[in-house]
């Protein structure tokens, strides 16, 4: 498989984690967003949306990290990223959606570039923007962890799930945008537990060949 991605991209990061947890090997192909390589015709031919990540399976090119991770779960069911029961799966998907639907979309690179170019937002304004929405999402995530009677080392129980694939990259982003994580001890504990696993360490932005 060929993974078209960018080292600092949160969506790329979450997919790298999922691939590593599943033990699925892939060829790393860097698409430099800062150099606008994703806007070139060659990449547009792969992914008309011109976003990373994209996963070339040899038979097709998959886009959109949530859909790709669900595809991986179906194609490579072991180890599972979703619980066996419907209630557990709903909870894990809800946690992932807090990040994937409510936090990340309004804090991704193209939104921030639009704020800079159209409204003249400086770095302080960008950090304030990101901090507002990250904190709102983390408030909910932390509260859900706090009331979960089955909470373990990770977001759900004692094995990594889909939720952790989403959470860890968002914590990385929060630190980059100088968000105060003091109010989120449970999130920080989950992030630390994930950081002990090789699958997460190998997926980290700083560990990628195109990191800068």
Curated annotation (Swiss-Prot):
Catalytic class of the enzyme: isomerase
Keyword tags: Aromatic hydrocarbons catabolism, Isomerase, Plasmid, Pyruvate
Cofactor: glutathione
Record carries keyword Lyase: no
One GO process term, biological-process aspect: glutathione metabolic process
The protein's annotated pathway: Aromatic compound metabolism; naphthalene degradation
All copies of domain GST N-terminal, residue ranges: 1-80
Quaternary structure and interacting proteins, as annotated: Homodimer.
Membership in a protein family: Belongs to the GST superfamily. Zeta family.
Protein name: Maleylpyruvate isomerase
UniProt source species: Ralstonia sp
Lineage of producing organism: Bacteria, Pseudomonadati, Pseudomonadota, Betaproteobacteria, Burkholderiales
């Amino acid at each position: 498989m060929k993974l078209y991605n960018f080292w600092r991209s949160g969506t790329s990061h979450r997919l790298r984690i999922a691939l590593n947890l599943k033990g699925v090997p892939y060829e790393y192909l860097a698409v430099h967003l800062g150099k606008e390589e994703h806007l070139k015709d060659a990449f547009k031919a792969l992914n008309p949306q011109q976003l990373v990540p994209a996963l070339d399976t040899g038979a097709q090119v998959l886009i959109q990290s949530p859909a790709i991770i669900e595809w991986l779960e179906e194609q490579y069911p072991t180890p599972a990223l979703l619980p066996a029961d419907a209630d557990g799966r709903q909870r894990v998907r809800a946690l992932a959606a807090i990040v994937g639907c409510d936090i990340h979309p309004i804090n991704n690179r193209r939104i921030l570039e639009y704020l800079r170019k159209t409204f003249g937002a400086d770095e302080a304004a960008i950090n304030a923007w990101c901090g507002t929405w990250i904190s709102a999402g983390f408030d909910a995530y932390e509260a859900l962890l706090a009331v979960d009677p089955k909470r373990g080392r990770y977001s759900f129980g004692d094995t990594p799930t889909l939720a952790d694939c989403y959470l860890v990259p968002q914590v990385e982003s929060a630190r980059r945008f100088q968000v105060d994580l003091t109010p989120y001890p449970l999130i920080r504990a989950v992030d630390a537990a994930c950081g002990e696993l090789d699958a997460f360490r190998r997926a980290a932005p700083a560990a990628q060949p195109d990191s800068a």
